[in-house]
Amino acid sequence: MEWKDCHVERADWLLTPAQRGNPASRVDRRHADGAAWSTGNDVRPLVHGAVYFAELLAAVRAQRAGDMLMFTDWRGDPDELLDGPESAIGDVLCDAARRGVVVKGLVWRSHLDRFQFSEQENYHLGEEIEEAGGECLLDMRVRPGGSHHQKFVVLRHPGRPERDLAFVGGIDLCHSRRDDAAHQGDPLAQPIADAYGSRPPWHDIQLAVRGPAVGDVEATFRERWTDPAPLSRSPRSRLRATLRGEDTRADPLPVQQPDPDPRGPHTVQILRTYPNRLRGYPFAPDGERSIARAYTKSLRRARQLIYLEDQYLWSESAVQPFAQALADHPGLRMIAVLPPLPDQEGRISTPMNLLGRIRALEVLRRAGGDRVAVYSLENHAGTPVYVHAKVCVIDDVWAAVGSDNVNRRSWTHDSELSCAVLDETRDSREPMDPGGLGDGARVFARELRLSLNLEHLDRDGDKEAAALCEPGRAFAAYVDSAAALDAWHDGGRQGPRPSGRLRTYHPPRLSHLTRALTDPLYRVIADPDGRPRSLRRHGAY
């Protein structure tokens, strides 16, 4: 196919307003052209928490009186350092509020701490912000057993819209997240499974978004902020809030500023998950599953390579669109990079966390055989890396980064936020149209994939990157690198360590009895279903 023939049609890859399936949301209705996406954005991937935190710190410190800072979080640790001494996130947000920045936060009011969630940490972060003049609400407006898992920050600057910025992805403002490419871990670490050590290496991604899409991310925040429902219907939580003197009523927000002007070549579609609840959200009465729908649609165009990094990769239903694509197109390959072990360990939690992945990989392998390659990561000391990234790239055209994992919980049950990105800029390197559908490889998607490939393979330079543009060569490079490192470990780690950080992932075996005993816990606790019954019956989203 000639270079001039490569053109990407947004509606081939992105959801239309009707396909989002949630007419109650403002996110699409606010667009004057009626589109379900915004154009003219500049999006940059921030790989690793240390990179993100440094940019976040600089952006917040540059804000002044009258500016706005809005954030959502799953877990927040006020003492987490963003970039060295005197950069604790709680202090940074409080300093902003004292300068006159309008600081508004929505942090999940977690389940009890004995279940290893984050209630006390989130309470203390919110308390500090409130004392400084900001407002941070602990939000439990979720399904039973659910969570608010969205992780984004919006910075607006009335009179200076060129500074407007949103950060969207999978990185919480908490311990363990400030790691870098060396993967030595965050000095302020949250304990997880022993195999990861006292400073768990942590791999994660966030996007920095500038342009009109900032308004769409802000609209998502405003929908949640203005929800008139009480923050919790639990009598126990409400009593505790009263005794503590917590703020339980959201103050009005300033009027939303016009969207920032176009400033780049990226089309961005904001994707969300909200569950179906007994008392529905006013902005999603039956829930929203646009993340699941977006994956289902985009995977139908996959022809050469699906590149995925994910914390879980659970659930037969969630991997079915991947499996269908693999079955339909015998030349399609899939690479998945996952954590080697669950973050929690125990007689109940370990098999509960493994069962969904084992079943998902069985479905994928039946569909794709050895065209499905699954890996974990280790640092150069041999310590496993906890993969918390949530990123997918399809044929170097469509890319998505967000808070969502590939599992039933993220696609139906918790609140999630993701950005799908299509770049107007074609990539000139061969193959120029890897999918063969006329879309043409796109700079953003290809560069995102290559940056991750190069890091995991311990390679750099334009020549190495150009070689990995070809999907088959990238797939083979992962196979060869992991095989060499596996053999070095199996041989007693004699001689120089091979380059690379990839290890072949071998799913553990669970007995039939363990599977049977674990299945109810997995379905109810680990990976519940938040869809309406009618969609469950039809296996649809």
Enumerate the language-model features and the residues they cover.
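Charged, low-complexity intrinsically disordered terminal segments
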Residues: 1-541
